[in-house]
């Protein structure tokens, strides 16, 4: 995705970034290393499943205030909907290469929460 390193560099100077991905530990660790993006994150978490319980647990682990924590992702099923269910805000950045099993309707944000839908990852700089 264009402008990802520049956008992450911008965001990390203003916010604490935590990478959360799901899958097999060895496979995901390798992908993170090969991406060259690990340096932009203060922590990385590889989980078996990304659901609201996991987001609750991570918010506790990292002492995140849910009212000011955002999940940014391209999967309604694993990123956006469970984050909203866990009381977080969410930014949906659709991507054409998102695995078909991750597709589902994006839920509306519950009262008191926000949902942004962006066309490009670089647009995050306009909001954060």
Task: Give the role of each language-model region.
Residues 21:
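Conserved phosphate-coupling serine/threonine residues in phosphotransfer and NTP-handling enzymes
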Residues 5, 9, 16, 24-128:
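Asp-based, Mg2+/Mn2+-dependent phosphohydrolase catalytic module
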């Amino acid at each position: 995705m264009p402008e990802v390193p520049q956008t992450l560099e911008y965001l990390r100077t203003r916010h604490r970034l935590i990478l959360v991905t799901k899958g097999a530990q060895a496979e995901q660790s390798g992908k993170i290393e090969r991406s060259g993006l690990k340096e932009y994150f203060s922590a990385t978490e590889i989980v078996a499943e990304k659901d609201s319980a996991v987001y609750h647990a991570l918010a506790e682990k990292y002492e995140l205030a849910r009212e000011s924590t955002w999940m940014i992702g391209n999967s309604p099923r694993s990123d956006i909907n469970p984050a909203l269910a866990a009381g977080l805000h969410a930014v949906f950045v659709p991507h054409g290469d998102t695995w078909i099993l991750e597709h589902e309707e994006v839920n509306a944000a519950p009262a008191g929460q926000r949902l942004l839908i962006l066309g490009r990852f670089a647009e995050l700089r306009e909001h954060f």
